[in-house]
């Protein structure tokens, strides 16, 4: 018999990681005018693979972080800017806003899938 956590699948882990990423992205946006602030992010794919116990991650783009590096240990990575500012700040507002919007949408999707999974489990428990 599998546990309740197993029944939720990867969605519960994804929500936690999306929240962590959301906090990093909002911190980046809040510090957009702070001199020498370095934009941070996590490698979501590597973190999710680590959290789910699957150590292999497929990268489809050259800009993806390699698995097994700092992100695999749960550390935030520094993002390399396309055009760094003169004051050493690496936050690019357009990039941060786009990443924030995408992360929020994916968070909501994971939440909806998790809610659907829980509703299905409740239906099975009630015997309806």
Curated annotation (Swiss-Prot):
Signal peptide start and end residues: none
Record keywords, A-Z: Bacterial flagellum
Tagged with keyword Zinc-finger: no
Keyword Nucleus appears in the UniProt entry: no
Subcellular location: Bacterial flagellum basal body
Gene Ontology annotations for the cellular component aspect, listed alphabetically: bacterial-type flagellum basal body, rod
Main location per the UniProt record: other
Domain of life the protein comes from: Bacteria
Known role: Structural component of flagellum, the bacterial motility apparatus. Part of the rod structure of flagellar basal body.
Assembly and interaction partners: The basal body constitutes a major portion of the flagellar organelle and consists of a number of rings mounted on a central rod. In Gram-negative bacteria, at least four rings, L, P, S and M are present, whereas Gram-positive bacteria lack the L and P rings. The rod consists of about 26 subunits of FlgG in the distal portion, and FlgB, FlgC and FlgF build up the proximal portion of the rod with about 6 subunits each.
Family membership noted in the UniProt record: Belongs to the flagella basal body rod proteins family.
Descriptive protein name: Flagellar basal body rod protein FlgB
Source organism (scientific name): Cereibacter sphaeroides (Rhodobacter sphaeroides)
């Amino acid at each position: 018999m599998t546990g309740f956590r197993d029944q939720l699948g990867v969605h519960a882990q994804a929500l936690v990681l999306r929240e962590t990423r959301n906090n990093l992205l909002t911190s980046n946006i809040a510090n957009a005018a702070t001199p020498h602030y370095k934009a941070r992010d996590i490698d979501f794919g590597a973190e999710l693979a680590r959290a789910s116990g699957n150590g292999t991650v497929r990268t489809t783009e050259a800009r993806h972080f390699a698995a097994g590096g700092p992100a695999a240990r749960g550390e935030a990575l520094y993002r390399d800017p396309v055009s760094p500012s003169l004051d050493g700040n690496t936050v690019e507002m357009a990039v941060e806003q786009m990443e924030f919007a995408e992360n929020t949408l994916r968070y909501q999707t994971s939440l909806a899938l998790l809610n659907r999974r829980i509703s299905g489990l409740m239906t099975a428990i009630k015997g309806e």
